[in-house]
Amino acid sequence: EKMIVGVLSQSEKYAIDNKGTLVSSGGTAGYCIVCVPPEKKYSIYYIQAILGSVQGEWLASLYGEIFRGGYIARGTKVLKQIPIRCIDFENQDDIAKHDDIVRRQKKLIAIGDKLAQVRNNPRKAAPLKRIFEALKIEQQNAINGLYGMSSDEQRQIPLIKEIYAAN
């Protein structure tokens, strides 16, 4: 598995590829690839969750180039600078935090896939959207805890899409 990162995007754009997709990359457009070396115990879903969190997006905006309309270039140069919380795989509490984030991230993806299938049916989409949004908040709270932040502290981080949104 690998993560395909949309280099120039307005919000988190970190897709997991488990189909072996061929990707072209380079510069401030296109895509870049993130892989976890086989000898590492990290899940690519853990990395995806951290990068897509409020903290990850904020750091991408600080390190990346910001373009008109709220587009942020988040290529390999930027991604290398974003600190991913290390997990001590000898510590059961750390392992549990990692696995909890991974489980929730996979569930978010599954619900997102279901939402895409029913997007033209508001009656079916509405409950899925509520579940998805509640799960996103739960995931963000878990990531806050991982970094030792309260929800109040996390809310002090400006949302990039609001700061750089095109009107």
Sequence positions of predicted segments:
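Polybasic, glycine- and aromatic-enriched phosphate-binding surface used to engage nucleic acids
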Residues: 1-96
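Non-catalytic DNA-recognition/assembly elements of restriction-modification systems
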Residues: 85-167
